[in-house]
Amino acid sequence: MHSLQRKVLRTICPDQKGLIARITNICYKHELNIVQNNEFVDHRTGRFFMRTELEGIFNDSTLLADLDSALPEGSVRELNPAGRRRIVILVTKEAHCLGDLLMKANYGGLDVEIAAVIGNHDTLRSLVERFDIPFELVSHEGLTRNEHDQKMADAIDAYQPDYVVLAKYMRVLTPEFVARFPNKIINIHHSFLPAFIGARPYHQAYERGVKIIGATAHYVNDNLDEGPIIMQDVIHVDHTYTAEDMMRAGRDVEKNVLSRALYKVLAQRVFVYGNRTIIL
């Protein structure tokens, strides 16, 4: 007796009439129940995006073969189990984003398995170990950037995570590192991108006299702070704020934006197309 499973079908394809009917009819043929369905058409690119949450008894290979025969050429589809995902978190010294994720994972605010936390400094070890989660130190001292990234990537691979989360990990990643985890690395940047790219954005914002500050969660690609944006938010500031005041206020925005972005990613709601995201 097979037990019911829940899976998420994600489809990107050239837009045509009748796509929803084709996909849902195949799901019906396989006696699968559609729990939730969301779709979007990008008229500028002519692309159709659909996320379908299914429940039933699955034969993945025949389901995907039937979909391939029904969808237009150039379609991309994937079928993955719904539910909990596994992450590795990379850190340096700042605790606010890491602490927020640890608390939410521990108390049910975020349905995720934190397999490990890896840092290039030992500063946050005691915080992590309070939650009975492994902490690994991979120091960058005496190593080139390529050598350190190689060691970090090997350490991450040992845990086989679905995603790598940069919770204020303050090192620029090499293209070789990024290539090992395509569209799997999520970063929180302490500004409302594309403004104030790079280091010390709060000091840049202070010098410009900005009236809002923000944070951006994005996928990491080869270009610094230019990967597809997942989530952003801002708060208002004024002339009385020092750069340090902005930093303190910004930390709350950063941790909230990161956890909200991660919630969407873990639920398999974020589609990457080009340098944009579609969230369904």
Swiss-Prot record:
GO biological process: 'de novo' IMP biosynthetic process; one-carbon metabolic process; protein hexamerization; purine nucleotide biosynthetic process
Name of one Pfam family that matches: ACT
GO molecular function, one term: identical protein binding
Active site residues of this protein: D225
InterPro entries in the cross-refs: ACT-like_dom_sf, ACT_dom, Formyl-FH4-Hydrolase_C, Formyl_transf_N, Formyl_transf_N_sf, PurU, PurU_ACT
GO terms under cellular component: cytosol
SUBUNIT field: Homohexamer.
Protein name: Formyltetrahydrofolate deformylase
Organism of this sequence: Escherichia coli (strain K12)
Gene name in the database record: purU
